[in-house]
């Protein structure tokens, strides 16, 4: 479940971030991963220094301008969109290693009398991706409105990894007093629940004696005797909870006052907030 990264010009620093600046509806510092793909109306990449100069040093790695969808459709009539897809992932065959019988014939170590495919035991039969999206858009003679809701769930091919997302977005534009006052607002919120597996257990599984049992006779997990301190990889995946929660908020609010046609007074503010929480528990 490693986080993805995005680069425009390639790596320019060893220690500092190489990610471009993401500007969502005029708010700098957003994260493209926190938007539903269906909510994006347009995307522009500023690659040259001149175009990105307005953002100062923050735009040194390039700038991505994202405009999200606004309310649309015939005035007085709501437009409802529903998008759904589901995918299944299957693991390819594992690496070619000695079977239990081949291991016995090689006489490399103690024969415990079992035939255990440690690598296969770390894998699910399949994993899946589930994405659901619902939006409601509309317009009136004085403005527009829009709301969308998104749910994603994905599991990894290893026994203990998954990612679940809940997202919502709301946008509103309203003109009042014969167009003298105009209100604009938007709010994007997303919560992500993640469970991380341990890729290192696959390396452990490849080095395990395939004649060892998964369980002891009393039902407890068998533990190998190893000078390297290696433990039962299945137990490590099943009995260690390594999870995290992410909360993201991105909002804008704007008031425009047009008292004089040649002049326009405007007050705007924006909010960008993120909370990261990690929890590690060991149940043995």
What is each model feature region?
Residues 4, 20, 76-93, 109-135, ...:
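Short strand-turn segments of transmembrane beta-barrel domains in outer membranes
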Residues 3, 61, 129-133, 165-169, ...:
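Transmembrane beta-barrel architecture of outer-membrane proteins
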Residues 80-84, 147, 183-185, 253, ...:
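Membrane-embedded beta-strand positions of outer-membrane beta-barrel proteins
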Residues 13-15, 29-31, 49-54, 71-75, ...:
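Short beta-strands and strand-coil junctions in structured, solvent-facing domains, enriched
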Residues 1-25, 41-42, 52-72:
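Extracytoplasmic beta-strand/coil segments of soluble accessory domains associated
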Residues 68, 82, 99, 134-138, ...:
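Residues on the lipid-exposed face of transmembrane beta-strands in outer-membrane beta-barrel proteins
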Residues 86, 91, 129-150, 154-161, ...:
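Flexible loop and strand-edge segments within Gram-negative outer membrane beta-barrel domains
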Residues 71-78, 141-142, 177-182, 260-268:
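Short loop/turn motifs that connect adjacent beta-strands in outer-membrane beta-barrel proteins
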């Amino acid at each position: 479940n490693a986080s993805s990264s995005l680069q425009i010009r390639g790596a320019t620093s060893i220690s500092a971030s190489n990610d471009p600046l993401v500007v969502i509806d005029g708010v700098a510092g957003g994260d493209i991963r926190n938007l539903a793909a269906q909510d994006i109306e347009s995307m522009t990449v500023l690659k040259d220094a001149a175009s990105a100069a307005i953002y100062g040093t923050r735009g040194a790695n390039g700038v991505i301008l994202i405009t999200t969808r606004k309310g649309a459709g015939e005035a007085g009539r709501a437009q409802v969109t529903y998008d759904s897809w589901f995918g299944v992932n299957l693991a390819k065959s594992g690496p070619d290693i000695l079977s239990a019988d081949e291991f016995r014939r090689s006489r490399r170590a103690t024969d415990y009398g079992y035939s255990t495919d440690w690598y296969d035991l770390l894998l699910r039969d399949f994993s899946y991706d589930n994405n659901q999206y619902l939006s409601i858009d509309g317009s009136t003679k004085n403005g527009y409105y829009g709301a969308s809701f998104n749910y994603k769930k994905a599991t990894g091919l290893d026994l203990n990894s998954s990612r679940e997302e809940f997202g919502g977005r709301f946008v509103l534009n309203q003109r009042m007093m014969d167009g003298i006052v105009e209100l604009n607002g938007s709010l994007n919120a997303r919560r992500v629940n993640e469970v991380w597996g341990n890729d290192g257990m696959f390396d452990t599984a490849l080095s395990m004696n395939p004649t060892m049992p998964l369980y002891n006779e009393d039902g407890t997990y068998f533990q190998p005797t190893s000078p390297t301190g290696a433990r039962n990889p299945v137990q490590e995946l099943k009995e260690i909870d390594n999870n995290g929660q992410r909360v993201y908020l991105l909002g804008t609010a704007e008031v425009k006052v047009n008292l004089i046609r040649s002049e326009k007074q405007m007050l705007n503010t924006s909010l960008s907030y993120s909370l990261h929480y990690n929890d590690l528990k060991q149940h043995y």
